[in-house]
Amino acid sequence: MKYDFSHTEKKWQAYWQEHGTFQAEEGQEKPKYYVLDMFPYPSGSGLHVGHLEGYTASDIVARYRRSRGNNVLHPMGWDAFGLPAEQYAIKTGTHPSLTTENNIRSFRETLQAMGFSYDWSREINTTDPGYFRWTQWIFLKLYEMGLAYQSEVDVNWCVELRAVLANEEVEEKIAEGLTVVRRPLRQWVLKITAYAERLLLDLDGLDWPENVKQMQRNWIGRSEGVEVDFELRCHRKMLRVYTTRPDTLFGATYLVISPEHPMAEKLATAPQLVEVKNYISKAKLKTELERTGLQKDKTGVFTGSYAINPANGEALPVWISDFVLTSYGTGAIMSVPAHDSRDWEFAKKFGLPIVEVVKSPHDVQDAVYEGKDSTAVNSSNSEISLDGLAFPEAFERMASWLELKKCGERKVNYRLRDWIFSRQRYWGEPIPVKHYEDGSLGTETDLPLRLPEVEAYQPTETGESPLANIPEWLYGTDGKGAFRRETNTMPQWAGSCWYYLRFIDPRNSEHLVDAEKEHYWMNVDLYIGGAEHAVLHLLYARFWHKVLYDLKVVSTKEPFQKLFNQGMILGEDGEKMSKSRGNVIPADHVLEKYGADAVRLYEMFLGPLEQVKPWNTNGIEGVSRFLNRVWRLVHPDTEGPAAVLDEAAMPGELLRRMHKTVKKVREDTECLKFNTAIAEMMVFVNDLHRTGNRNREAIETLVLLLAPYAPHISEELWEALGHPESIARAPFPTFDPALAANDVLTIAVQVNGKLRGTFEAAKDASKEEMLEAARAVESVRKFIEGSTVVKEIVVPGKLINFAVK
């Protein structure tokens, strides 16, 4: 019988669906394993082969864990609120819900055609009112805890989208050619900064890629420093600055405040006022990215005012520059140009003094010195001297002196900013808040608060969402009086902040999640997705989870114990797949031509899962040939029935080879080294064909090993081998450590006790064979030739030592 992948795959996909093969068990007797993909946004362009990589990896793990006896939760759903559906609605008038529904149908069909073992009974959709009522419920809890508040803030306004962007989204949108400016808007903001320290400290206990943890650490940006008060000459006020280098206070030669600082215009003297106002106006139009880029040209304006350095009494000019942000520290900095590159460039441009206060290996007038390994110089007054002290001691001494003089205090600061949570869009979760005529706020009690039907989806020119144009939804009265509903909606990130919890208990209408089920399933054992979410989704989800932990809704401090970032699959041209490049390879095309098992195997065989890899159609054809070779082990006659297999005991060599294969595949699968696991199975298949052996145990073991990787062909062969139950319920093969042990050992060779080389020898090699091999090692031979070997020491299986003179 010839292998017909199309017939086989449809047959077993129908079987799995009919029998609910992959539904997680409700009982809690088995050890659980929760493996989760970052669920997709269902776009209109469908899935391409690059999208399938992470889903294939998680499915291999899910199938493997079931075969190891775990109760596996492996769900799928849709992060379906978002801008693309709304933009399509603006163009066509099609309601976003219809577009989303069609896109979800397409995505689901592709994922099912890949044979992924999702528990589809738990499918969720963030746009379903039964789902987003709980997103709204979480928002109200944040509001009750004081973690959601309104603020008039300068936001990143995308002109083309008429929408607010989070700080983390700006760079991507500018790269897409969109225009982003700063403008003030009333916004809902989530106080993620209240959790900054916990978000930072709890990273240490997570099994995540170190680069992702470091990105979050950098984004949170914890720093220890001192807030220092500089007395403003002629103003009888203090200007407070934040510095992480109080040890360099003697080297401060000017101060810089942000354009938004409350004293910016007040500090401008009459001759400088017009220039200061113009500079502030221009700065307001720039994004943070434009203002803080290290490569940007430094700009600034002198206010005309001076402040007194508390360390040496010198009058320092106060400047305004847009590289200083009000949102970090105090919005004012002291500039030490000798030891900070940005300050040095600014000082050089505007002719400001540069004073060395950390001993430098070169002239600081020519180049900045930012090292911390040297000692303080030129840093003393009648009360304190830092000269000769290294950084830690100088920091402590100056901080203590400033506190003693009551002109400074130690402070911990974070780069992290509160999360701007509002979007001026239609297609998002309505924020369940009412605004009463007296200015007070109320909350919706009847959740979910649904979206109304609208005729036009465009945001208003004033920055409000289309909801502001629907009076019958917008206005109402209750026991407290007349109100106007909140017209902002939540960002796309909202629904993805907690979806992993809803998969545990997706149909619960009374609670977000049942406490007993949550306690059993949490936290997620393996989370697979892209590293591009390091400081967006992953940080936001951790924040919400900690809030839910404080509310005793969840029992764990963190949602995702292990995170794995798959590498990107590039187009055949070696570039990122995109419509504009024309190098996108639709998933449906390769599925139709090669079948799901070949696609699954090829994507995992391309290389290490975490690496970036180009697609190569020739490679998938090779994998397809491999599957046909596996098929012929059971069906050698393409026209006839399955072969009669040898039931006798396996030859010793093949038995050892089989146990080594089981050991290797098992270890590699557990470590997500799928490419080397597949390579090992290929070697075993070659051995079976080379020897012509059709031993039942060997072939059944191979099929069981292959099942998590290529489930359809494995199911078909398992059935042909006489097993009535699905292979999905069969246990993974075990191995005998003695039979799986390596027959070849690496032997160290020493000459007079010093390592001079190594060689490989059979485990049962004789002493004479080992000595002969040792003498033949080139790096050893030159040390013993021409010398007298007075003694030969052989430690079996480990080393040989030649004593020579």
UniProtKB/Swiss-Prot annotation:
Its EC number is 6.1.1.4. A motif ('KMSKS' region) lies at residues 576-580. It catalyses: tRNA(Leu) + L-leucine + ATP = L-leucyl-tRNA(Leu) + AMP + diphosphate. This is Leucine--tRNA ligase. GO terms for cellular component: cytosol. One of its GO terms (molecular function) is leucine-tRNA ligase activity. It comes from Chlorobium luteolum (strain DSM 273 / BCRC 81028 / 2530). It is found in: Cytoplasm. The gene is leuS. Belongs to the class-I aminoacyl-tRNA synthetase family. The keyword Aminoacyl-tRNA synthetase applies. A motif ('HIGH' region) lies at residues 40-51. PANTHER family: LEUCINE--TRNA LIGASE, MITOCHONDRIAL, LEUCYL-TRNA SYNTHETASE. Keywords: Aminoacyl-tRNA synthetase, ATP-binding, Cytoplasm, Ligase, Nucleotide-binding, Protein biosynthesis.
